[in-house]
Amino acid sequence: MNQIQVFISGLILLLPGAVDSYVEVKGVVGHPVTLPCTYSTYRGITTTCWGRGQCPSSACQNTLIWTNGHRVTYQKSSRYNLKGHISEGDVSLTIENSVESDSGLYCCRVEIPGWFNDQKVTFSLQVKPEIPTRPPTRPTTTRPTATGRPTTISTRSTHVPTSIRVSTSTPPTSTHTWTHKPEPTTFCPHETTAEVTGIPSHTPTDWNGTVTSSGDTWSNHTEAIPPGKPQKNPTKGFYVGICIAALLLLLLVSTVAITRYILMKRKSASLSVVAFRVSKIEALQNAAVVHSRAEDNIYIVEDRP
């Protein structure tokens, strides 16, 4: 009877070891992942190994890294590191730049002196690709650029949105139809609001100065935003500067041409005056010579008998 009790007690003690239990760890592709493994050093520092697959009866199969308790003595790849305090019992394995092929079972085996005293922990690693996240979209707001007197803008819907509610209970089904007819909206630069309620579906608008947003399924709100200050156009200023420079250059050329024309005219006028004076002097000299010759002829005629 006592032997049967001892046998049953032994089976109960061995039963947990016969069931495989894994510690699940998840990682992301391209990021480091750490498999935690520690042991108590109150009995002293001992050797530890990491391997791929389940822990065998002794040592590690497909060894990745090995430590003697003070430092790493074997390292299969630079991607496998022990970044904890090894001498304090922290032998956690860190896999750098993890990939999907790193997924699988890993064994951390701490060798403790004695029969079947080794500390064995099996990890199940799952490395999945990173899921891209999209930033939330925000509704855009358009501001009208035209300013001045108020203008009237009317909108016309191309369809009549309807909503049908059907009851699946025993009473007869009921149908509710919502109809929206847009009314002309007066748009002012300083205060303009237009509200539309009772629209079951989203109704976009294409005219400037309004933004349509739907908070839920059964109501829409259309709001017109007053125009802001018109933005300056640098291209327009550039063209204005070019036009001013061209006008200044044309004015300078015209001034030079007019000045030169006036100087040439004055020079030609002075030359004509000098020529006129010279011709006048020559005429006077010729007249004097003719007059003297006439007097000589008179004297000659008078001397004859």
From Swiss-Prot:
Annotated glycosylation sites: N208
Tissue specificity comment: Expressed by stimulated T-cells. Expressed during primary antigen stimulation. Expressed at higher levels on B rather than T-cells, both constitutively and after activation.
Source species of the chain: Mus musculus
Effect of mutating T137R: In strain: HBA
Subunit structure: Interacts with STAM. Interacts with SELPLG.
Bias (Low complexity) ranges: 139-152, 161-177
A Gene Ontology cellular-component term: brush border
Tagged with keyword Nucleotide-binding: no
Leader peptide range in chain numbering: 1-21
Protein name in UniProt: Hepatitis A virus cellular receptor 1 homolog
Residue intervals passing through the bilayer: 238-258
Domain of life: Eukaryota
